[in-house]
Amino acid sequence: MSLVIGLDTGGTYTDAALLDVDRGVVLATGKALTTRDDLSVGLGGAIAKVLADFDGAPEEIKMLPLSTTLATNAVVEGVGGRVGLFLIGFDEAALERADLARALGQDPVYFINGGHRPDGGIQAPLDIAALDAAAHKLKSEVSAFAVAGHFATRNPLHETETRDLLRDITGLPITCSHELSSSLGGPRRALTAVLNARLINLLERLITATQNIMAQQGLTCPLMVVKGDGSLLQADFALSRPVETVLSGPAASLSGAAFLAGAKSALIADIGGTTTDIAFLHNGTPRLKKDAAFVGGWQTMVEAAEIRTCGLGGDSEVAPILRGRTGGLTLGPRRATPLSLLALRWPSLKDHLSRQLDLAVPMATDARFVFPIMPDGVPQWLTRSEIRLAEKAIAAGPSPVAELAATQLALGAVDRLISRGLLGLSSFTPTDAAHVTGAFTEFDDEAAMLGAKLMARQRNGAGIAIAASPLDLAEMTLDELHRRSALALMDAALAHEGGGEAAVSSNPLLAQSFRKIPASNDQLVSVGVKLNTDLIALGASAATHYPPIANTVGV
């Protein structure tokens, strides 16, 4: 009997399963809430539940494969450490290719003379003096470096020389683009290197926490990490190339869905807390795409299963549209801890919500809370104002945004700390909406209802409340999730068949056909598209959300 424990850490839940590989039988399962401030708590809870139902000794476990959506979620949400990018032999025009400028955001970039020609010969000498000056300036301002050289896949010398100099001066993690891909396309290699550098600290926290729990439980088996193509990496190697795990969780889900459903051809949608991952089965297996993992709008140079990931999930942040006369809601791509869930950990949340509801005038920060995720303390590469705010957040614990940040400048700092993964956000989400409608009742119904009341009374540009009641607000939220999910499925299907990106959602006529039409509406024209394959939905909230989504796409 060959036994393995499969472990998956998502944005909301951590799951474990004990499997007899020889017989293909699941012997025990365990589920715990993912604890983002200390991942070992959720990991330990899930593994402990599995081992409690296992009669054998821990030494009988032969392997522990770990998959995670944390890297996927971080890329989709734009969360991660501050990265310094060195572009060697490129000019500023490189930033306009592969969406590199958008990926960098406010992170620093330096253009260094050097690089190579297509034949591998030196294009220009490497500017060591400029590198040295930049390294000393940035060593206390960033968490990691990314290095991309002109034609580095033909000759990586300037990338490796830059890496060695940065390592000697700063001691920080460094990602070279030629180590991640042998393909041409410098800006896309640079993009992939930036994403990799941002994810290093995140994956290190996860792997270290898992190794500590394994040691506590007496598990001596190898720890492996699932790659985006479904294969396995040794944990130590994964630490140097975390971008390889960017579709780890979706790849594991796809493999599991194919095994359980036994389908030969189908569209698979895995809805989690942060993302929906969409893939296609052909002859029972997914298709691999070399250098083409598509995650949250970024086309990377990572080999992975053909999976498309979008920022739609049960925990997507819901925000009111306050400008204009029509109002409405936006959804995602940022994840927020549901109010109904945070209330279980922090019961005084409901007191804060009630006090906000007692105010005569609604505030934009109503029903919005933050909590610190800084187990190693405040990073010193933050700005002075960000450091002060981070220290205040650690001292306060979970807090209303309005109490932590009383000015627009402070609110901007809060947003930056959230985007760096140092503060967690809690606000109204589709999970809360499902509590209000009664479709899901696992967490705190009262907190969800208070949040819905606060959201419903927010006013649009005409001074009109965006929803007539908490129930209307909840139904608006779920309708938007279902509409956007249906569009994502159809966009993925048409892209899979060569129809281009966003073929449905960018077409006003087709996109309009996915809106929920009131029963009283007398339409003169009806337009629609239909999915012509089986749909397999999985994920914690699939049973709640996918019946209406399937109906929308005609399955």
Predicted regions and their residues:
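N-terminally biased helix-coil "hinge/interface" segments that flank
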Residues: 1-555
